[in-house]
Amino acid sequence: MELKGVQPSNGSANGNGTTNAASTEKTDAEKHTPERTNWGNGLEFLMSCISVSVGLGNVWRFPFTAYENGGGAFLIPYIIVLFLIGKPMYYLEMIMGQFTSQGTVKIWSVVPGFVGVGYGQAFGTICIISYYSSLLALTLYYLFVSFQSELPWSYCRDEWTNCVNSRPQEYVDNLLSGVSLANESARNFSAIGSVANEETEKLQSSSELYFLNVVIKEKLDISDGVGDPDWKLTLALLAAWVVIFLVIMRGVKSSGKAAYFLALFPYVVLFVLLIRAVTLEGARDGILFFLEPQWGELLNPTVWKEAVVQCFFSLAVGSGPIIMFASYNRFDHGIYRDAMIVTTLDTLTSLLGGITIFAILGNLAHNLQIENIRDVVRSGTGLAFISYPDAISKFKAVPQLFSVLFFFMLFVLGIGSIVALQSTIVTIICDQFKGLKYWKVALITSACGFLMGLVYVTPGGQWILTLVDFYGGTYVVFILAIFELAGIVWVYGLQNFCDDIEFMCNRRVSLYWRMCWSFFTPVMMIIIFIYSMVTIEPIKYSELYFPEAANIAGWLLFAIGAAQFPLWGLWYVSRHPQGTYWKSLKASMKPSERWGPANPETRREWVIFKNHKAAQRATQKDVSKLGFFWRKLTNFCGSNK
């Protein structure tokens, strides 16, 4: 199609070297438009993408998700999902951000009727930010107390009945004397151990009781409220947000420099922990337990759903950071290479993190003389704040050092992720209101993030975290990612999109990308989303079901996020009438005059390129012997010949 939003001058179009005065004046005015800040260099962008995509999801979430969904066999659906959904979505978001030099909302000048996708993703991002910062607060708390002469979770308090010390000798002595730890069926954070006989009293480790009674002061019923914020965790939450603000206050100028540390330091610690872990007794059993495939799970649709959820969570697609980071690139930056590096590194890091974690859990099972490693594995926060601290307390040499390294690594990983999420929100606001100072918006949004995070440092905070993550994070992000892909590929058109990529990257789009974007990726995502909705069950925390009011609040949260798409679409149609409502709706499905490269000179070159492509296809259509069906099929698959 011929572009009419911005036309080349007569001189440019005719090739005679002349331009009219009106075109010159317009060009000069456009040249005075402030340009977007760019990364200091391409490596800053790559490091920033690594810092957000290689985060807590790799070291924390992936090991347990893989273990619960087939062990080593989970890698097969995960890698398939990575190549058919993860990589295509990641590359697409990089392209959209770099091509337009705009954030998550402004990119929808490509299909203005889909602007609600950007606002909905912003809502989902805010939900994730709200609870993510509370995890940083917990991590900071454990980091601070790790400097004590004795790890505070390694021994029991007098008021804790049925408690077993996490310190190694006492633990083993208790086990050998016939007192064992039982897996508490009523709790997600179960006690470690086995039952010697039916009358054996159920015991809990000191690391578990420390987390539940000292750190979060957990409530097992939130029907009467969540309680008041804990002052220690509140201070840790405040410290986390101060660090976040300092990193993002100058935009990519400051976050780009911090990205080197945020991306590389965790690998240093992870390799140190890996070397230590694989040398521990029982490590081999833990690693084999993690990698041992359960082939029957491959036929379970839930496993494939979890692979998609893990892929989205790990790569941070569908929530805006990748688009935002890419928008600060130079227009000709080689993003294809970066997309391949980050997505591959993300998978390798997940595997590395899983081996490290399960090697240490294997050592924990060995020390406790427990044959089934399943009894020492926990999900969610229990893995990071119960199982791992419990294992560290049994290290014979300087357990404090390894505790500090582990929790500092978690904190850095978390900061890398939340910096990207928070910067996404700040960029959306600054794109919308050009006159606002970036640091002021960063300060205000950081203060709001701190206030929202207070609910998660209450005794009922883990309940709220589970609720918001399930309804406001996972499902909102997933459904809007489907609309995101559909808007670009099916409404704007894959052929147009491939032309834009060819112009920007100076390379043809391969069949792999075209087939993924046009068919495999959207179809798989739609099928998995429908399956998730059909098989959805009431959520639980610590094996306890949420109150009915909490479930209603969760569905309301999901509805608010998902409703952003149609509501903002209707708003755009009402604000841009084209006669009848049907004509206005059709107009909202076409690119606005703002769509295209931000730089005026690049934009004019792009218009010429697109019009040349349109004329070329019109000529080919006249002489082509292909039937109507085959022409439509090649257009659908984005053939840019």
Curated annotation (Swiss-Prot):
Biological source species: Drosophila erecta
Lineage: Eukaryota, Metazoa, Ecdysozoa, Arthropoda, Hexapoda
Pfam families: SNF
Compositionally biased intervals (Basic and acidic residues): 25-35
SUPFAM superfamilies, per database record: SNF-like
Transmembrane segments: 39-59, 72-92, 109-129, 229-249, 258-278, 307-327, 341-361, 401-421, 441-461, 474-494, 516-536, 552-572
UniProt similarity note: Belongs to the sodium:neurotransmitter symporter (SNF) (TC 2.A.22) family.
Residues carrying a glycan: 183, 188
Gene Ontology terms: biological process: amino acid import across plasma membrane; D-amino acid transport; neutral amino acid transport; sodium ion transport
Alphabetized GO MF terms: amino acid:sodium symporter activity; D-amino acid transmembrane transporter activity; L-amino acid transmembrane transporter activity; neutral L-amino acid transmembrane transporter activity
Identification of the protein by name: Sodium-dependent nutrient amino acid transporter 1
Subcellular location: Membrane
Ion transport among keywords: yes
Record's function text: Unusual broad substrate spectrum amino acid:sodium cotransporter that promotes absorption of the D isomers of essential amino acids. Neutral amino acids are the preferred substrates, especially methionine and phenylalanine.
GO cellular component, one term: plasma membrane
Membrane topology (UniProt): Multi-pass membrane protein
Cytoplasmic side: 1-38
InterPro entries in the record: Na/ntran_symport, SNS_sf
Biased composition (Low complexity): 9-24
Start and end residues of each stretch annotated as Disordered: 1-36
UniProtKB keywords: Amino-acid transport, Glycoprotein, Ion transport, Membrane, Sodium, Sodium transport, Symport, Transmembrane, Transmembrane helix, Transport
